[in-house]
Design a protein with these regions (language model features):
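Helix-loop element at the rim of GNAT/NAT acetyltransferase active sites that forms part
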Residues: 15-29
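Conserved GNAT acetyl-CoA-binding A-motif
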Residues: 96, 103-114
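Conserved acetyl-CoA-binding loop-helix of GNAT-fold acetyltransferases
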Residues: 82, 88-101, 124, 128
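A short helix-loop-beta-strand connector motif used in the catalytic cores of GNAT acetyltransferases and
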Residues: 35-46, 76
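A short beta-loop-alpha structural element at the N-terminal edge
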Residues: 1-14
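Conserved acetyl-CoA binding element of GNAT-fold acetyltransferases
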Residues: 70-84, 138
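Conserved beta-strand in the GNAT
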Residues: 46, 52-61, 76, 81
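Conserved active-site alpha-helix within GNAT-family acetyltransferase domains
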Residues: 93, 105, 117-136
């Protein structure tokens, strides 16, 4: 297993993995988003196993309020994914540790994340990795003007 910070030629590999986690997005869309990171404000890590892209993690600094925290900035795990064929080998934990180390290097005292309420696997991963549940919410939106 090799964990590296994705850049240059490895960013498209990470974007392809991210699209497996977030199927509503296209790789080019994610690459464009990642390229807008303010230097030092976000990072993408790539896990390689036997020369094959196996997983990725995206983390960022959040300076706004983060549920359950009392410091700023907070390192935030925006997404983490390991392909099914590579699960159970410690890749997700290694990716998380890379993100946590990145956040520590930027002065963060706390690290946070979120997941869908019905994602039992993600909840178990987070709890097993030392996260404590901070809150459960349901989010709502309402259109204020008619769409054209």
């Amino acid at each position: 297993m090799v964990i590296t910070r994705a850049s240059g030629e490895s960013l498209p590999q990470a974007a392809a993995l991210a699209c497996e986690l977030w199927p509503g997005h296209a790789p080019d869309e994610l690459l464009a988003e990642w390229e807008t990171f303010t230097p030092g404000e976000g990072a993408v890590f790539l896990a390689m196993e036997g020369g094959a892209p196996a997983g990725f993690a995206q983390c960022q600094l959040r300076r706004d309020y983060v549920e359950g925290t009392d410091s700023s900035p907070v390192g935030y795990l925006e997404g983490i994914y390991v392909r099914e064929a590579f699960r159970g080998r410690g890749l997700a934990r290694a990716l998380l540790q890379a993100c946590e180390g990145w956040a520590r290097e930027r002065g963060c005292a706390q690290f946070a994340s979120d997941c869908e309420l019905d994602n039992a696997g993600s909840i178990a991963f987070h709890l097993g990795a030392g996260f404590a549940e901070a809150n459960r919410i349901v989010c709502f939106t309402k259109q204020l003007r008619e769409e054209a």
